[in-house]
Amino acid sequence: MSVPPDGDRTRGGDEPAAGSGLSRRSFLGYLGVGVAGAAVGAGATAAVGAAADGDGGDDVGAAVVAFHGAHQSGIETPPPAQAEFVAFDLPPDASTATVASLLRDWTSLAAALSEGASHELDPVPTLAGEPASLTVTFGFGPRLFDVIGKTGLRPPGVADYPPFQHDELQEEWSGGDLLAQVCAEDSVSVTHASEALISAAAGRAALRWRQAGFGRTVGVAEGQTGRNLMGNKDGTGNDEPGTAAWDQTVWASAGPGVPDWYVGGTTLVVRRIRMDLEPWYAASLRTKERTIGRELESGAPLGTDDEFADVPLQAQQPDGSLQIPSSAHVRLAHPDSNSGARMFRRGWNYSDADGAGLIFVAINADSTTGFLPVQSRIAAGDDLNHFTTAIGSAAFAVPPGVAPGQYVGQTLLEA
């Protein structure tokens, strides 16, 4: 891929661009909103992990996150170090009864594993005793609603999106009728839970794709922003979970066009973003900082000296040019550049034989008013597109949480 026009390809030698600014409050929820760049440069919260400072190994292994509640776990929950996304396809002749049976089993199994308890469907129960903050979050792809005869109950924004500009989507990382997002502080806990869910689905749903990601492991100091594989700070700008702004962005509420079963749910857009790291390594510091719109070392928006300062979108350099270039990622991802559109972002790094990058997760009550408009803007002109390419994309409706005795998706299946 080519580098941005203003980029020089020498290593080092450049003075860092002038500091820049964006206040934590006003920038919360902006950075990284949208395209490949949104996840990679502006901030995918989970790309850095969320381990508490000073936790011992025994405490980490025994930690439990409640499975039952008004919302599914794994959304508002602080993102742990390990994650796996497992997508399944339903057979063409799948019945509503078959889907309901599978979801009953998955719900029961996931609830037990989250508590560190054994379950009759767990093929390796000896691995269940250390959940390590395990969460399992289930989602429904767009075709599921057709399969069960409830097309009219599909939430807005749950669709197979066509490729955006610069996307090179591959079937092996895209689509799916069902999703299990499995997260924990320990990779054994994650893999064990994923394998148990796959085993329980046999004969009712077939594995479509599976991708694993990682962030910082337990021990990263609380309150610090970590970095993705490009060296950029990731996670600076999300709204704080539990706040009114966060709730409005994430949780579906009753209103026109919102199916009753979906109230209390949300939508996950999962994008696999490959990083073209060699050109990024070769780019100068000035090119990197002007591509993102932030200082590489501090994470401060150009023109400020504070990572959480307001992004000075109107600030100019002495020669009259914009302090933050018109094609910089933070400018194009900023809500002020997108009529206020925002999303909650999480992400995990990946590295395998095919390359390295980020598994980016955009979370919105309605992706048509958050992810989609921002993604479209970034896809059209973000300099970060010179270094990143989305190779996978899928959208899933996440049902609300359940009480003991209920199963995930029951309000839809029995609607």
What residues fall within each predicted segment?
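Long, histidine/aromatic-enriched segments associated with O2/redox biology
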Residues: V3-P4, G21, S26-A47, A52-A415
